[in-house]
Amino acid sequence: MSQPAENWFLTAVVAGMLAACASSEDKPVEPNLLPTNYKQEILDTLSRTLGYPTNVREAYISDPALGPVGKDQRYMACVRYNARDANNHYAGSTDRIAYFYGGHLNQLIKASKEQCGNAAYKPFPELEKLCLATKCE
């Protein structure tokens, strides 16, 4: 074999090996898996995003249910709570909507009355008891 032919052949073999490695068959994510750990994922998110995540009052949550998100259906849950503001005063009740994708929390954003106005809320004592100190464990 001549030198250019050997180079071409070697390049083709290496390219084929790299292509075989790159074509892993990842399973597509099922977007509408029922979120089983939704309360903990919401607690984790609120503990990072609330200014004062402890001593939350009047905490409620709805069970995840399929609802419309654009043209798709996704699991969502509503959360209502009264947390303290930057001045350490209770700010009043806040409604948030949690969107789930593939069984995990994807977004937790402010909810409109249309989104959570008819939610079947139940007490969420885990949020009211949230404690971040090591002595809490």
Predicted features, each with a name:
Residues 1-9:
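Bacterial N-terminal signal peptides that target proteins for export
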Residues 17-20:
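C-terminal motif of bacterial Sec signal peptides marking the signal peptidase cleavage site
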Residues 22-137:
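Cystatin/cathelin-like cysteine-protease inhibitor module
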